[in-house]
Regions:
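Hydrophobic helix-coil surface modules that form long, contiguous segments used
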Residues: 2-15, 21-22, 28-37, 46-49
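Aromatic- and Gly/Pro-enriched helix-to-coil junctions and flexible linker segments
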Residues: 26-27, 89
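Short, structured beta-strand segments at or near domain termini in extracellular proteins/domains
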Residues: 202-214
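Residues within well-ordered beta-strands of beta-sheet-rich folds
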Residues: 13-15, 93, 208-210
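Short, polar loop/linker segments at the starts of domains and inter-domain junctions
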Residues: 1-9, 188-198
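Functional-site microenvironments in short loops/helix caps that host divalent-cation chemistry
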Residues: 17, 32-190
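Extracellular structured ligand-interaction cores
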Residues: 4, 9-11, 76, 141, ...
Length: 214
């Protein structure tokens, strides 16, 4: 997260809400997992190799595994446990794009550190009332971004035992922002950079959609 850098952000629009399970079902019902034009080449190879046809932990289009056992999928809740590849394909399906990490960071800095975090005790993603969305900008799910996990300009590794963290991980991974329902409030901040490989699905990940403003 250091050193501090200046980044130019062009005008953009960001959906405050996470993409919902109902929206993901629309993607599935429109044959989204079988349309190569929506997918990055590596993503297409990944879903075909591992027969990915739905979010991780979905049993079918009605039920899923959760911390509480098998549950009926709530269409209003944010879709979770999706890979970067899936998030990217969905954004293309909706004729949108994934936000950059700096767009999400800017969004987070404009809002209080409130949301569905660990202390709330929900232990799951929840639907947010649109009227209170700005008061719930943190937590719920880690938000995929289109940004590669790379060092900031002027970055220098820590010394001694911490020297391996984080530079050795800055290879072929993407940044996620905002925290999740499993993130303690004192652990998250607008600048926090989480990172996973584009095929990873086990983490508490979701997506918001962005677009350019002309």
């Amino acid at each position: 997260e250091s050193p501090t850098n200046s980044v130019e952000i062009c005008p953009f629009e960001l959906n405050i809400d996470f993409v919902s399970n109902n929206e993901w079902l629309e993607f599935i019902n429109n044959d989204g997992y079988n349309r190569p034009e929506l997918w990055l080449s590596d993503g297409w190879d990944f879903i075909k190799k591992y027969d990915v046809k739905k979010p991780l932990y979905w049993l079918d289009n009605k039920f899923k595994f959760s911390f509480f056992g098998v549950e009926r999928i709530d269409g209003s809740e944010p879709v979770s446990h999706i890979s970067f590849y899936e998030a990217d394909a969905f954004s293309r399906f909706k004729k949108k794009r994934l936000p950059t990490e700096f767009e999400i960071e800017y969004f987070l800095t404009q809002n209080k550190k409130k949301g569905n975090l660990l202390e709330n005790g929900n232990f799951k993603e929840i639907s947010i009332n649109k009227q209170n969305a700005m008061e719930n900008s943190y937590g719920n799910l880690w938000c995929w971004t289109s940004s590669n996990y790379l060092p900031y300009s002027g970055y220098k590794p820590f010394s001694e035992k911490l020297s391996e963290y984080n530079q050795k991980f800055m290879c072929n991974q993407f940044v996620l922002k905002g925290g999740s329902y499993a993130t303690p409030k004192n652990h998250i901040r607008s600048t926090y950079r989480n990172f996973y490989y584009p095929s990873d699905r086990w983490q508490f990940s979701g997506l918001r959609l962005a677009s350019d403003l002309k």
